[in-house]
A protein has these predicted regions:
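Short, charged/polar micro-motifs that form catalytic or ligand-binding hotspots
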Residues: 36, 78, 111-112, 134-138
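Walker B catalytic motif
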Residues: 106-109
Length: 182
């Protein structure tokens, strides 16, 4: 099945607003949901995950036209959060909206994130995998891996260490070694 125009975020996070507005009223349930304290709708779950990864951050939507929305981030804590939210938002929206069985490929999800936020991003990506999304991550961050491991250890889903494979790529004498770490 072909995706409709602006139905998915591309590798640069483009179309995140279109994707968000398209699925705004959808329920996010099961392993994808962090909890239900604010509700099950996409906006509420995006707000929960943003606050989990970036404590003190709140997501709000303002309707600016018949089919136009403005996504606003409110920061109650730090005045200089940086670019981390900008890089994380497309990952969060993609993870929450991609269909079960779909594939989410993420390059350097740790970009511009503090160590704790990196770990929480790994946790988020593991929860998406537990919900049936095929997740491929290219990372240099042990914190991302530790977040994935933490999700498995907490046993909040049926996912186990056997459902995850980590590969370490190493250049040796102009040859590439691929080492499986599980």
């Amino acid at each position: 099945q072909e995706a409709e125009f602006n139905d998915i975020c591309d590798c640069h996070g483009s179309n995140v607003g279109d994707v968000f507005s398209r699925y705004l009223g959808d329920d996010i349930i099961g392993a994808r949901s962090l909890n239900f304290t604010k509700g099950t709708k996409l906006l509420m779950q995006l707000d929960e995950w943003c606050n989990y990864i970036f404590p003190g951050i709140a997501v709000r939507v303002e309707k600016t036209g018949s089919q136009m929305y403005k996504l606003k981030m409110r920061n109650d804590v730090a005045p200089n959060v940086g670019f981390g939210i900008t890089y994380a938002l497309p990952i969060l929206v993609s993870g929450l909206t991609i269909p079960e069985g779909g594939m989410l490929i993420v390059e350097n999800p740790e970009a511009h994130l503090h160590a704790k936020a990196q770990s929480n991003m790994g946790y988020f990506l593991a929860r998406m995998a537990a919900a049936g999304v095929r997740v491929i991550i290219e990372t240099h961050s042990e914190h991302i891996v530790n977040g994935i491991r933490r999700m498995i250890v907490e046993r909040k889903t049926e996912m186990s260490h056997e459902d995850m494979t980590i590969y370490f790529f190493q250049n040796k004498n102009e040859e590439k070694d691929i080492i499986e770490i599980t």
